[in-house]
Regions:
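Histidine kinase transmitter module recognition
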Residues: 41, 155-158
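Short hydrophobic/aromatic segments of transmembrane alpha-helices and their interfaces
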Residues: 41, 45, 63, 115, ...
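A short alpha-helix capping/helix-coil boundary motif
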Residues: 26, 38, 111-114, 145-148
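Non-catalytic accessory/interaction domains
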Residues: 57-60, 110-111, 143, 158-196
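Structural helix-adjacent loops and short alpha-helical linkers that scaffold large soluble proteins
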Residues: 10, 90-96, 137-145, 171-179
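Acidic/His/Gly-enriched intrinsically disordered linker/tail segments
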Residues: 71-140, 150, 156-157, 183-188, ...
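Juxtacatalytic substrate-recognition/specificity segment
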Residues: 1-59, 63-72
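Extracytoplasmic/secreted proteins, especially bacterial periplasmic and envelope-associated proteins
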Residues: 4, 33, 47, 51, ...
């Protein structure tokens, strides 16, 4: 798992990583820096790998590079959620990431540009954030998309970043203004359609 994510995002950004399973019913996992916390129910779930990938991805997106402001929380959760699909794409030959994202895009998600405290950790922030990243990947192509991701992680390591700073980086590496695309995916109501 670590090998796959480092191939996508760049070197693991911290000194250590571990996981702790507790005998409690939390109903969620938590990505504390260098140590993910899972409850027993999640650890025994058939989708435990998805939880593990999500929390491991947070070591890059959330722990090493964190959202500058709470309104940018989609950067942490969108990247970690998209990592779940990237993991499947790399480890399951039958997985079609475009079909999966199209299926997800058929659902209704509220705008996430500034979700506010009551909606900060809703599915909209996680899933629409992942869809925004997939739309960016479609638009700029794999080579540029993963260059954006790796550069974001490298330049922002042990720091923070904002949506505007990600847009500026993506625009620089793509050689054109990516802002309108990203802003549509974060703010438009209804949400845009995926192009592939």
């Amino acid at each position: 798992m670590l090998d796959v994510l480092t191939s996508l995002f760049g070197p693991y950004p911290l000194a250590d990583y571990g996981a702790l399973v507790i005998d409690a019913r939390l109903g969620y996992a938590l990505e504390t820096q260098t140590l993910a916390l899972f409850d027993r129910q999640i650890s025994l779930s058939s989708s435990t790998d998805i939880f593990q990938v999500h929390e491991l991805a947070h070591q890059w997106f959330g722990n090493s590079v964190t959202a500058r402001l709470w309104r940018d929380i989609w950067l942490n959760e969108g990247f970690a959620t998209y990592a779940e699909s990237l993991w499947h794409e790399r480890t399951d030959a039958s997985f079609d990431i475009d079909a999966s994202m199209r299926s997800l895009a058929r659902r209704t998600f509220a705008p996430i540009r500034d979700p506010g405290p009551d909606a900060m950790f809703t599915r909209s922030v996680y899933d629409r954030g992942a869809l925004a990243l997939h739309a960016l990947r479609i638009d700029v192509g794999d080579e540029t998309f993963f260059a954006i991701v790796r550069t974001w992680v490298a330049e922002r390591a042990r720091s923070n970043g904002s949506t505007e700073e990600l847009i500026a980086l993506a625009s620089r590496l793509a050689g054109r203004d990516i802002g309108p695309l990203v802003e549509r995916w974060l703010s438009a109501d209804p949400m845009p359609a995926l192009t592939r």
